[in-house]
Amino acid sequence: MSAFKSYRVSHEYVQTNPATPEQVFPLLCPVREADWLPGWQYRLIYSDSGVAELGCVFTTPNPPASPSGQPLRPNQAASENTWIVTEYDPTTFRIAYVWINPGKIITELRIQLTSAEPGVTRSQICYRCTGLSEEGNRELRGYDRKWFEARLQNWETTINHYLRTGEKMPAASG
């Protein structure tokens, strides 16, 4: 029996979006994310409709750097995350995903949209990440509250720019 003990990180964040839940919900899709998120890359593996739906499967490249921005060791190749939509309810504006970075981390992402006031949406976003190995545990230790908030604030800024202008925000240079 292994002495491995998994490490888990959970974070929640509430975004405010300048649009109705009916306008925001379709953007929470691997295909539509390319419309508003600079640098978003995905490969659609399975979807009957061609967009997000229950059971939709897609992959995304894992960035070749840790959350702290440190480059991976030269012998570490970038990997792919495999995602599946585990909940999809456009009537209640709920969507959930599970994705796995093989041998390292499994992540649950749950999003619930609610109308805050006319033309404004509150997006409750919950992440739960679990290490699958010592390497995954080490990576997760960098997923602190500061890292998470920076990531979600960027998400909020980019989706809100799209909702206000109909255009993708220019990618940051540098």
Task: Indicate residue ranges for each PLM-predicted region.
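Hydrophobic ligand-binding cavity/cleft-lining segments
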Residues: M1-V51
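Short, surface-exposed coil-to-beta transition loops
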Residues: S10-E12, A78-W83, I105-R110
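A short, structured loop/turn motif at beta-sheet edges
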Residues: P18-E22, E87-F93, Q112-R122
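Hydrophobic pocket/interface hotspot
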Residues: Q23-L28, A34, F58, V85, ...
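Short, intrinsically disordered, mixed-charge
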Residues: P26-E33, P90, T157, H161-R164
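Short beta-strand segments that buttress and anchor functional surface loops
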Residues: C56-P74, I95-P102
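Hydrophobic-cavity lipid-handling domains and compact docking modules
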Residues: L72-Y88
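Beta-strand/loop substructures that line and gate deep hydrophobic ligand-binding cavities in soluble
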Residues: V98-Q153, H161, P170-A172
